[in-house]
UniProtKB/Swiss-Prot annotation:
Protein name: Large ribosomal subunit protein uL23
Originating species: Brevibacillus brevis (strain 47 / JCM 6285 / NBRC 100599)
Function: One of the early assembly proteins it binds 23S rRNA. One of the proteins that surrounds the polypeptide exit tunnel on the outside of the ribosome. Forms the main docking site for trigger factor binding to the ribosome.
Membrane-spanning residues: none
Keywords: Ribonucleoprotein, Ribosomal protein, RNA-binding, rRNA-binding
Length: 96
């Protein structure tokens, strides 16, 4: 990876992930080649928190159609990051 900011592409914000934030679990989209160690280091350095665990999931490509044209969405990887109890919360909704 080039830098720690390249490891975390974007936070995944859905109804389910918003409920997970109460348990101090946060979900990020990460590159397919990123490993758990890189993800942990990136979250700790960028947000200044301590990470307890990292789980990763490869989201498979899904078939899509647009009229007679068919194709697939891109495969991507998400990381579920659990923070320690004494870590501060990450503020994704600041200024909204």
């Amino acid at each position: 990876m080039k830098s720690l900011h390249d490891v975390l592409k974007r936070p995944v914000i859905t109804e389910r992930t918003t409920d997970m934030m109460a348990e101090k679990k946060y979900v990020f989209e990460v590159p397919l080649k990123a490993n758990k160690t890189e993800i942990k280091q990136a979250v700790e350095k960028v947000f200044g928190v301590k990470v307890e665990a990292v789980n990763t999931v490869r989201v498979p490509a899904k078939p899509k159609r647009y009229g007679k044209y068919s194709g697939y969405t891109s495969e991507w990887k998400k990381a579920i990051v659990k923070l320690t109890d004494d870590s501060k919360e990450l503020a994704f909704y600041e200024g909204v």
